[in-house]
């Protein structure tokens, strides 16, 4: 009846069977389609199932199948992420419950919990590194490791080095003309009064040096200690090696060592009545720390130390004086 549409006869019949946007495919899509045809001539991808899915998404999805699995940088088709497996959760470190009942904690040799044992190992490593640093500083500054032996010029050297190492404000003028003994006799509060900005930190570092010197003295071949001559109950002033023929030093012997050196440890422990053997622990934390250093137990605290002291009540070595006071004790057999 009517003639065909003017433009219809000029269109290839094969184009009539394809979707409109196939004609406008890019060169990249044609090349990809050709490559696929060479590799697998017996199979070709199906066109989009629905009109809403464009050919661009279709070809991207198809190209995604050609990439190796480890090409995580390659572009993924919309919805491809839904096929991915959920990421694995990072492995959690075991948590030690320090509040758990005593019966539920794992114990290591020595009666310590696993947590305490690990803490002591770490602290021992830290102490070792600190001692190395102090030894290095002594060589650089040409000073002794014991602050008690420092001259005023040695004190100034140590102050400059500590300020530089730990980025502290200049404090040399605040401690001029002070020798090592005078510096060691000062309290933390006195350090703060002389240097409000860094006095407390400086006092802490000096305390580390004093402890290190004390450790070195105790472990040196010529170190002398006080031990029982016959039994724990009958101790004397004789100076003998702390090993006592292979036996470790006892706490009461250690306390006596501190008491007999008031110039070094008078701030921590002192005699109230030496003739009667009455003494007072002024700084329980420091005494416990020194005892921990001696026994190589960095996690030592006063709770543990006081339990050991109370055990001496039954053995007749230490007791509470007639007028009971906090942190005041009496040797049953005075000097």
From Swiss-Prot:
Record PROSITE patterns: ETS_DOMAIN_1 (PS00345), ETS_DOMAIN_2 (PS00346), ETS_DOMAIN_3 (PS50061), PNT (PS51433)
Q: What SMART domains has UniProt attached to this entry?
A: ETS, SAM_PNT
Q: Compositionally biased, Low complexity: which spans?
A: 1-20
Task: Let me know which tissues express this protein, per UniProt.
Answer: Expressed in a very restricted set of primarily hormone-regulated epithelial tissues with particularly high expression in the prostate gland. Significantly lower expression is seen in other hormone regulated tissues such as mammary gland, salivary gland, and ovary. Expressed in prostate carcinoma cells.
Q: What GO MF annotations does this protein's record show?
A: DNA-binding transcription factor activity, RNA polymerase II-specific; sequence-specific DNA binding; sequence-specific double-stranded DNA binding
| DNA-binding span(s) | 249-332
Query: What keywords does the record list, in alphabetical order?
Result: Activator, DNA-binding, Nucleus, Transcription, Transcription regulation
Gene Ontology CC annotation, any one: nucleus
Q: Which residues form the PNT domain?
A: 129-213
Sorted alphabetically, the Gene Ontology BP terms of this entry are:
cell differentiation; epithelial cell fate commitment; glandular epithelial cell development; intestinal epithelial cell development; lung goblet cell differentiation; negative regulation of cell fate commitment; negative regulation of transcription by RNA polymerase II; positive regulation of apoptotic process
Q: Which family does it belong to?
A: Belongs to the ETS family.
Subunit text: Interacts with the DNA-binding domain of the androgen receptor. Interacts with NKX3-1.
Q: What does this protein do?
A: May function as an androgen-independent transactivator of the prostate-specific antigen (PSA) promoter. Binds to 5'-GGAT-3' DNA sequences. May play a role in the regulation of the prostate gland and/or prostate cancer development. Acts as a transcriptional activator for SERPINB5 promoter.
Name-wise, this protein is: SAM pointed domain-containing Ets transcription factor
The species this protein belongs to is Homo sapiens
Lineage here is:
Eukaryota, Metazoa, Chordata, Craniata, Vertebrata
